[in-house]
Structure formats: structure tokens, C-alpha cells
């Protein structure tokens, strides 16, 4: 029972009307605007909802629920009803059944609800019996009006009994749950990949030390660049890509020309004669310099 607490019903009351009782005592009176003794049938636009939503909107019912509902046209100037409802549609099944004798007062139609889009919807167990008045002029009474019937009476039930969960097709169509709802993350490529994983930086390896001063001067000066680079970055890495400013060292040929102007070199004389009288008169007292002595000793060796 849903909403029955608002009704004043006697103990043991059960609402199981026949087709004739539904038509004569409820549908005919509602269409004529006459009062109904016990307003036990709710008035809603049934085609705005899925059938499993309807039980909680009913005023009374346990396994079947009753509603008054308007019915619209599918096309403005046609007589075909619009059967789309909620996340699916109602589809007629079987032949129409006249209600009333000897002359039919109403027509009973059975329909089955399909979840999803027509014509590939998923059949459900929800059934509707629709009662509409017979011999009613349903031509377009108003221009561009889609209303086909102001009121029809509908009985809704699930043939398996009770409340059945909505099918997967209806759930997906309603957007309640996304099938395969996991979000797939694609691997980062291109520029983003380069940003996320910086290229490997090779450590800068210093050249070998030259403890021998003669070996130092024997190396070409261009092979020993001095890097002068200022940067605002917090990290500076030596790389061949960076421009370098090279300060040249005196070349060996320059030393040879220098010593050629003073004649043969006598290393012993330069050491024994600190005053420079051993043939280095133009150099003054440079022979006493330790660095110069090492140079002279080197050039005094035979090649």
C-alpha cells in the first residue's frame, strides 16, 4: 500500500475492481467531471515516468496500481498515441478488448514496457492495461494540440510480482550508471611525456690532472677551453651545447722564437748563474725564477 493512509477505508478493504467497474464507476465519472466516492486512483502523467517509479506515486496498491493519465498524440494531426515513457516505451500486445455490453463503453488495451530506444528496447515484465472511452471524437480539436485524451485509466503491475529492479538498458539510458564507468587514462606522449620525464643528464667528467709542467705545455692550448657562462637558473650543467669563450695559452712556437733570440740554452749555466750572465742577458734575472728553471731544464733535453 502506498499513500493509503490518506484514505478513510474500512477494515479488510481490498481494491480489486472488474473491467466494467473500472469503466462505469471511475473512468466515465472522471471524464464527465463527476465526483468519485473514494478518490483512490491518483492522477499523474504516466508517460513521464518508468513503470518501476509508479508504485510510490499511487494512492493505493500492493501488487497492482491504478492511475488516471492524459494521453498525447505522436504527431499533431495524427491519431496515433505517443507511447514513449521515461527511459523506454510502451508497446501494444494482443488485440483490443471491448468493455461493456451490449454496446462497448470503453476499449481495453494491453501494453508491455521496453527499456531503451525503439525498436531495439529490452522487454521487461511490466504490464499496463489501458482503458479508454469508445466512440469519442479524437480529431484535433485545437490547432497544434497534441492532446488525444484528457483521461485514460491505467492498471500497472509486474507479472513476476512485487517491485522489480530496472533493467540494465534502462539504467544506461537514464544515465544513472555509466557502463564501464572507469576512466581510462592514456599514456602521455609528445611534449607532455618530455616534461614528465626529463632527459638523462650525463655527469661532467673532469680531465686528467697534469702534475708535470712540461706535459701541460706540450698540450695544444685550444684543447683546454675555459667556460664563462652566467645563468639565472638554479642548476647549471656543463654540456657541449653551451657556447664557450676560450682563452688561449702561449703556444710552444712562441717559446721557441723567444729562446731563439738569445742563442743556445745552457740549463746548468742558468742555474749556477742566478744573475743571468749565462747567456740570458736579455732576460735579466728571470733565470732565478723556479718556473723558468723548469722550462729551461725541459728544453735542454734532447728530442
Curated annotation (Swiss-Prot):
GO molecular function, one term: sequence-specific DNA binding
NAC domain ranges (all copies): 9-159
Induction context: Induced by drought stress, salt stress, cold stress and abscisic acid (ABA). Induced by methyl jasmonate. Induced by infection with the rice blast fungus Magnaporthe oryzae.
Record note on disruption phenotype: Increased root length in young seedlings.
Matches recorded under Pfam families: NAM
Predominant place of localization: nucleus
Tissue distribution: Widely expressed.
Top-level taxon in the UniProt lineage: Eukaryota
Keywords of the record: Activator, DNA-binding, Growth regulation, Nucleus, Stress response, Transcription, Transcription regulation
Family annotation (Gene3D superfamilies): NAC domain
Free-text note on domains in this protein's UniProt record: The NAC domain includes a DNA binding domain and a dimerization domain.
Quaternary state and interactors: Interacts with NAC071.
Additional comment: Plants overexpressing NAC048 exhibit growth retardation. Plants overexpressing NAC048 exhibit improved tolerance to drought stress. Plants overexpressing NAC048 show increased tolerance to salt stress. Plants overexpressing NAC048 exhibit increased tolerance to cold stress. Plants overexpressing NAC048 show increased resistance to rice blast fungus.
Protein name per its UniProtKB record: NAC domain-containing protein 48
Source species of the chain: Oryza sativa subsp. japonica (Rice)
Taxonomic path: Eukaryota, Viridiplantae, Streptophyta, Embryophyta, Tracheophyta
